[in-house]
Amino acid sequence: MEPTSKKLTGRLMLAVGGAVLGSLQFGYNTGVINAPQKVIEEFYNQTWMQRYGEPIPPATLTTLWSLSVAIFSVGGMIGSFSVGLFVNRFGRRNSMLMMNLLAFVSAVLMGFSKLGKSFEMLILGRFIIGVYCGLTTGFVPMYVGEVSPTELRGALGTLHQLGIVVGILIAQVFGLDSIMGNQELWPLLLSVIFIPALLQCILLPFCPESPRFLLINRNEENRAKSVLKKLRGTADVTRDLQEMKEESRQMMREKKVTILELFRSAAYRQPILIAVVLQLSQQLSGINAVFYYSTSIFEKAGVQQPVYATIGSGIVNTAFTVVSLFVVERAGRRTLHLIGLAGMAGCAVLMTIALALLEQLPWMSYLSIVAIFGFVAFFEVGPGPIPWFIVAELFSQGPRPAAIAVAGFSNWTSNFIVGMCFQYVEQLCGPYVFIIFTVLLVLFFIFTYFKVPETKGRTFDEIASGFRQGGASQSDKTPEELFHPLGADSQV
């Protein structure tokens, strides 16, 4: 039975692969706005000239560009907070399928913005694709976590982050001036998102609905059993069904969990706090400052070909996500998150030193590249992939949609703050801007060390019962004490 449960079947690969196309969309739309900044700003200037007969004021251009970057996160905040409205009503798979309509609308708006001489169309398109991506960051980890066997849940959950970083890398390559990041083709660069949306529309109808949703939410045991047999590649799915039934019985003893209930109930208070702080540790680590403004950071560091250095960081990004994929089930979530936070803090200090001494020591530009590459690598070891799927692991079926909505909203809100404020904070702090992120990284390390339990190898119900047993006094317990009933290996 044990070896069978670990099997990576064709149907499971199809289900996860179809879902993470949404993750790729998220990554692509995060990274695509970076490289063509100058040509899009020129489009804004030309449009302004045609309307008002004068060049666009520099302050207005900065505001419009910051809005073009940050409006994506506003859409993401709205989308992430709406996850529960869809997944409980339409199911996990059907929700992902329906949301592709937003991607098609966004592609049309951004693709025809130049023809329509309207920067408003581009900004609206960025907002709509942001809503799509906000929903996706809830749908994909939830679906992947629910279709995956316990032994593969961490590795397959990391594929969400792998989809994101591959999307960022594709955006960086497509954004090269010699490919699509030029005066003529930038509308195509922004609208090419219709291709993964179309591909997902073709694949998802062949993917199964989440068996947990079918059994626990819809009480369709026969369908859930049939889906499990296909996903596991075996006729014996007794253990999975038994675990889901136990979780279903536990849900029936609980009243319906709303977002407010997550914060009122002692059983949910600690896991929701952990979920939110882990999401903040991802976004407030400074990683999106690197993603959004990497080209300009490399320019300031004196790098001759900054766009290629940016692509180099994208390759490092992807490579270390693959590393995380293979070690997450061995090393554990908590350990990797701690290593990632500590490494990023060290690289942020190096980056600060390199930028501060650049004028006196030109060779410091090379140190800045090493520091940024190291920063990105350590991010993908832990803070990149782990917050996405650990939220789904911390909660049982009942509170999971509400918890993912709260965690996603926290992620996108902090994403918005970084995207909107980094340019201004950088102007204020100069080369010392990454000291702010260093302090935050140290604080997140301390929180993770004292509060975050290990979830590796545990069923959803085992993890949730660990918090329930803590009850009202759980805030006084260490992760080891809180999860002691789950076995001696609760910490890695």
Curated annotation (Swiss-Prot):
It is a multi-pass membrane protein. Pfam families: Sugar_tr. One of its GO terms (molecular function) is dehydroascorbic acid transmembrane transporter activity. Residues 34-66, 113-120, 177-185, 294-306, 356-365, 423-429 are extracellular. It catalyses: D-glucose(out) = D-glucose(in). GO terms for cellular component: apical plasma membrane; basolateral plasma membrane; cortical actin cytoskeleton; cytosol; female germ cell nucleus; female pronucleus; glucose transporter complex; Golgi membrane. It is found in: Cell membrane; Photoreceptor inner segment. Phosphorylation at Ser-226 by PKC promotes glucose uptake by increasing cell membrane localization. Its main location: membrane. The modification Phosphoserine is found at residues 226, 465, 490. The chain crosses the membrane at residues 12-33, 67-87, 91-112, 121-144, 156-176, 186-206, 272-293, 307-328, 335-355, 366-388, 402-422, 430-450. InterPro entries: Glu_transpt_1, GLUT, MFS_dom, MFS_sugar_transport-like, MFS_trans_sf, Sugar/inositol_transpt, Sugar_transporter_CS. The modification N-acetylmethionine is found at residue 1. D-glucose binds at residues 161, 282-283, 288, 317, 380, 388. Facilitative glucose transporter, which is responsible for constitutive or basal glucose uptake. Has a very broad substrate specificity; can transport a wide range of aldoses including both pentoses and hexoses. Most important energy carrier of the brain: present at the blood-brain barrier and assures the energy-independent, facilitative transport of glucose into the brain. In association with BSG and NXNL1, promotes retinal cone survival by increasing glucose uptake into photoreceptors. Required for mesendoderm differentiation. Belongs to the major facilitator superfamily. Sugar transporter (TC 2.A.1.1) family. Glucose transporter subfamily. This is Solute carrier family 2, facilitated glucose transporter member 1. It comes from Ovis aries (Sheep). The lineage of its organism: Eukaryota, Metazoa, Chordata, Craniata, Vertebrata.
